[in-house]
């Protein structure tokens, strides 16, 4: 079983800039996956090359997306292998 390590949110987000991330929203089973382009002091997020996922199903590309901080449930980094395996499970 893996151990979960607590991290400070701002340094965690700043370290993810330029990397692929997944952002789960508080409602609707919505998740956005894309490259974290920027984050501000309020932790609002700007994603590039974004895809919308609802209830685990890819709904297609959206391009550039801005997500207001109070809508975010969690943010996680994703790697290429993890994303490819999830897409293969979809097919």
Curated annotation (Swiss-Prot):
GO cellular component term of the entry, any: cytosol
Q: Pfam families, per this entry?
A: LSM (PF01423)
Residue pairs linked by disulfide bridges in the UniProt entry: none
Give GO terms for biological process: mRNA splicing, via spliceosome
Where is the Sm domain positioned along the sequence? Answer: 8-81
SMART domains reported for this sequence: Sm
InterPro entries reported in the protein's UniProt record: Lsm6/sSmF, LSM_dom_sf, Sm, Sm_dom_euk/arc, Sm_F
Give a yes or no for keyword Cytoplasm in this entry.
Answer: yes
- Keyword terms: Cytoplasm, mRNA processing, mRNA splicing, Nucleus, Ribonucleoprotein, RNA-binding, Spliceosome
Gene Ontology MF terms in the entry: RNA binding
**Localization, UniProt:** Cytoplasm, Cytosol; Nucleus
Q: How does it assemble?
A: Core component of the spliceosomal U1, U2, U4 and U5 small nuclear ribonucleoproteins (snRNPs), the building blocks of the spliceosome. Most spliceosomal snRNPs contain a common set of Sm proteins, SNRPB, SNRPD1, SNRPD2, SNRPD3, SNRPE, SNRPF and SNRPG that assemble in a heptameric protein ring on the Sm site of the small nuclear RNA to form the core snRNP. Component of the U1 snRNP. Component of the U4/U6-U5 tri-snRNP complex. Component of the U7 snRNP complex. Component of the U11/U12 snRNPs that are part of the U12-type spliceosome.
Q: Function, please? A: Plays a role in pre-mRNA splicing as a core component of the spliceosomal U1, U2, U4 and U5 small nuclear ribonucleoproteins (snRNPs), the building blocks of the spliceosome. Component of both the pre-catalytic spliceosome B complex and activated spliceosome C complexes. Is also a component of the minor U12 spliceosome.
As for family, the record states: Belongs to the snRNP Sm proteins family. SmF/LSm6 subfamily.
What protein name is recorded for this chain?
Small nuclear ribonucleoprotein F
Origin species, per record, is Dictyostelium discoideum
Name of the coding gene: snrpf
């Amino acid at each position: 079983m893996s151990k979960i390590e607590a991290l400070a949110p701002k340094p965690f987000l700043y370290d993810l800039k330029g990397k692929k991330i997944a952002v789960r929203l508080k409602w609707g089973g919505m998740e956005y996956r894309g490259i974290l382009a920027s984050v501000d002091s309020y932790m609002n997020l700007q994603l590039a090359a974004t895809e919308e996922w609802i209830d685990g199903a890819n709904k297609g590309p959206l391009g550039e997306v801005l997500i207001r901080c109070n809508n975010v449930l969690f943010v996680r980094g994703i790697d290429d292998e993890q994303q490819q395996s999830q897409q293969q499970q979809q097919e």
